[in-house]
Swiss-Prot record:
The keyword Acetylation applies. It is found in: Cytoplasm. This is Thiamine-triphosphatase. The keyword Hydrolase applies. It comes from Macaca fascicularis (Crab-eating macaque). One of its GO terms (biological process) is thiamine diphosphate metabolic process. GO terms for cellular component: cytoplasm. SUPFAM superfamilies: CYTH-like phosphatases (SSF55154).
Length: 230
């Protein structure tokens, strides 16, 4: 994804007929892929507590998701995705209050920043794109990702990418429309894979996030929190 774009997304629980419905709506299957994501944080989960999500995708590289200006929007979330390593390092140092580490590779600052692996799992994903009927064919297409993690949890994501905050409301309206067409209940919430992983395999970390967010809603990740994490 191009640096600096804003990701607006909603997670949902896909059913056995979701792919067929996407085809009926004119969706195009872009690809099917299998990949491993590894997430990093401090022992205190300082990044997650600050709504920042650092991961390394196998054969793809590093990504840091940071909250957009609006942050969590009901059942939707808005995040900026950083993929340039010097930019990621600068943001990590800012969030963790570290100075003097320069702007080098992410791997080189993991130890100095006290970052360690907190989760790692494999996902099988199908990626779809489509343009809603009644919208400008030249507008950016909506993305729908359907993923199943190797620990058995499946989650879908409807996503739009925009360049500036002023475009977010229109993107949200499209996400609402497509979610409804896919049969997603208006009030449905779906945790990101990372959150379910922590709940099942790192319950102490999950409980820490619950405590931090006790005055807010249950941590939904952004995915990321997914709801930020893919």
């Amino acid at each position: 994804m191009a640096q600096g774009l804003i990701e607006v997304e909603r997670k949902f629980l896909p059913g056995p007929g979701t792919e067929e419905r996407l085809q009926e709506l004119g969706g195009t299957l872009e690809h099917r892929v299998t990949f491993r994501d590894t997430y990093y944080d401090t022992p205190e989960l300082s990044l997650m507590q600050a709504d920042h999500w650092l991961r390394r995708r196998e054969d793809s590289g590093w990504e840091l998701k940071c909250p957009g200006a609006a942050g969590v929007l009901g059942h939707h979330t808005e995040y900026k995705e950083l993929t340039a390593e010097p930019t990621i390092v600068a943001q990590l140092c800012k969030v963790l209050g570290a100075d003097g580490l320069g702007a080098g590779d992410v791997a080189a600052v993991l130890d100095p920043l006290g970052l360690q692996e907190v989760a790692s799992f494999v996902t099988k994903r199908s990626a779809w794109k489509l343009v809603l009927l009644g919208t400008d064919e030249e507008e950016p297409q909506l993305k729908v990702d359907l993923g199943t993690a190797d620990f058995g949890y499946a989650v879908g994501e409807v996503e739009a990418l925009v360049h500036e905050e002023a475009e977010v409301p229109a993107a949200l309206e499209k996400i609402h429309r497509l979610s409804s067409m896919l049969g997603v209940p208006a009030q449905e919430t779906a945790p990101a894979k990372l959150i379910v992983y922590l709940q099942r395999f790192r319950p102490q970390n999950y409980q820490r996030l619950l405590e931090v967010n006790s005055s807010k809603q249950r941590p939904q990740a952004t995915e990321d929190p997914d709801n930020c994490l893919g």
